[in-house]
């Protein structure tokens, strides 16, 4: 809840899944393998290895696989949602691809709407009281 309160107060969320867009980070395994996120420690997302690759090579691979750019591809229904400013589409690991448009939507969307319908007014009160 503290990230939602912070968002309502104008702060950037600390939790990456509440940013809506992936940030540059590295998940590093014990063998030095580097991945763009701890939820994407999978062969197809491997960026390189700190034992054998330069950081600029690892960064180029991140751009090559389009990891951060993909997190920006949201359906118009998501972008126009009244809760988008606080939900931000969530983490890309929880998104389904619409093959026709090439855009994504969070598969918890309806649950988020139910949650915000019930809790957002109270969260706004807390945020206002904290300022």
Locations of regions flagged by a protein language model:
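Radical SAM enzyme core and accessory elements
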Residues: 31-34, 42-45, 73-131
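C-terminal accessory region of radical SAM enzymes
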Residues: 1-8, 39-82
């Amino acid at each position: 809840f503290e990230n939602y309160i912070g968002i309502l107060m104008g702060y950037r969320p600390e939790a990456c899944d509440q940013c809506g867009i992936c940030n540059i980070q590295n998940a590093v395994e014990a063998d030095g393998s580097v991945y763009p996120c701890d939820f994407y420690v999978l062969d197809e997302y491997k960026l390189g290895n700190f034992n054998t690759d330069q950081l600029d090579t690892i960064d180029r691979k991140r751009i090559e696989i389009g990891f951060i750019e993909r997190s920006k591809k949201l359906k118009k229904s998501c972008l126009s949602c009244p809760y988008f400013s606080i939900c931000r589409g969530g983490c890309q690991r929880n998104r389904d691809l619409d093959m026709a448009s090439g855009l994504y939507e969070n598969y918890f969307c309806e649950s988020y709407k139910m949650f915000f319908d019930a809790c957002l007014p109270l969260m706004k009160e807390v945020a206002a009281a904290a300022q």
